[in-house]
């Protein structure tokens, strides 16, 4: 969660004391922990048979409980223009399957408003993914800011709803959904251009490609051997007579092999490859 833009930044419309209070409400360690545990922000949510429908609000209830009196007191005191709005520019979800591709099933993922009893998709922000299509990335963009209010006994805010369909015979986890978003809070609101929900199918990760390439150890050995070979053909640092072609050919001539254990071999240890751990 973050505040962006001077016209939408609540901290510039209230006193420093209220700004500190707001920072504590939104960014304290406890608030961040609640965002993860209650809303699954940035965490993997497993879709199981015993949890076929998942409703995840984008704001924890404890945060809403703290924000409502903050906005109300500022509004009643004439410091704020409204009782507060929640704005979410975009919600991104990464979806992967955890069963075989031939499993018959699908996921319906959409953005809803908890102020709606039916929890219908807002502005057509709904995507259906069949099991064989996964993995995939999906995105949602609401067209309005949600008022921070109570509807009955429910705190109104946006929520990500995931429905699991099919997967007969699969009682365990069939898919994993990891959602990320950035909630903003302001005393001003707006409407936004409609954008259809996005669905991008992702190619599965080809981990076999890593094994088809030379390993790091093999590349290191190869580079060392190349350095050894090149060092044995370096010309000595002496002046050469351009007209003495016969003398040059003798210098460039490769020396005969040196027997292991001979005195000459000990003087040429610089040409031997180093030992790499693990080989």
UniProtKB/Swiss-Prot annotation:
Localization terms from the record: Host cell junction, Host plasmodesma
Low complexity bias spans: 256-266
Region (Disordered): 256-279
Comp. bias intervals (Polar residues): 267-279
Name this protein carries in UniProt: Movement protein
GO cellular component terms attached to this protein's record: host cell plasmodesma
Superkingdom, natural source: Viruses
One Pfam family from the record: 3A
GO BP terms in the entry: transport of virus in host, cell to cell
Role noted for this protein: Transports viral genome to neighboring plant cells directly through plasmosdesmata, without any budding. The movement protein allows efficient cell to cell propagation, by bypassing the host cell wall barrier. Acts by forming a tubular structure at the host plasmodesmata, enlarging it enough to allow free passage of virion capsids.
Main location as per UniProt: host cell
Record family assignment: Belongs to the cucumovirus movement protein family.
UniProt entry keywords in alphabetical sequence: Host cell junction, Transport, Viral movement protein
